[in-house]
Amino acid sequence: MSDPSEGSLTPGELLVDDAPVELNAGRETATVTVENTGDRPVQVGSHYHFFETNPALAFDRETAYGMRLNIPAGTAVRFEPGAERDVELVAIGGDRIVHGMDGLVNGDLDDEATRERAMDRAAAAGYRGVER
């Protein structure tokens, strides 16, 4: 790391404390077992609402609602066809309003009517791991 007093900063460089940075401190977490039942690999990015991931991924979507992968920003997890693995999820922060993704939620994650509508949409669309 450059010493800012020496005037040798690199554009875009981050100056951080020497102490380790704890990611997602104090946020709710959950672990789900995910199986890729499809015939192609599926890659999921760090900030994607995990509930809305590819319908071929089989896991407890009820548990995953309102959560994302607990991995550093800008990274992803790849699920190979037929493979099963455990992943840790973390609660989405901020205002907890989700739009886009696969269009299942489009609203406030903490609103019970929005949650029920999202579960119904996922079940109707054939997402694996939704019990309805």
From Swiss-Prot:
Keywords recorded for this protein, A-Z: Cytoplasm, Hydrolase
InterPro entries assigned: Urease_beta-like, Urease_betasu_sf, Urease_subunit
One Pfam family of this chain: Urease_beta
Protein location: Cytoplasm
Catalytic activity: urea + 2 H2O + H(+) = hydrogencarbonate + 2 NH4(+)
Keyword Cytoplasm carried by entry: yes
One GO CC annotation: urease complex
Any one GO MF annotation of this record: urease activity
Record EC number: 3.5.1.5
Pathway(s): Nitrogen metabolism; urea degradation; CO(2) and NH(3) from urea (urease route): step 1/1
Gene3D superfamilies: Urease, beta subunit
Transmembrane regions: none
Top-level taxon of the source organism: Archaea
BP term (GO), one: urea catabolic process
Family from the record: Belongs to the urease beta subunit family.
Subunit structure: Heterotrimer of UreA (gamma), UreB (beta) and UreC (alpha) subunits. Three heterotrimers associate to form the active enzyme.
Protein's name according to its UniProt entry: Urease subunit beta
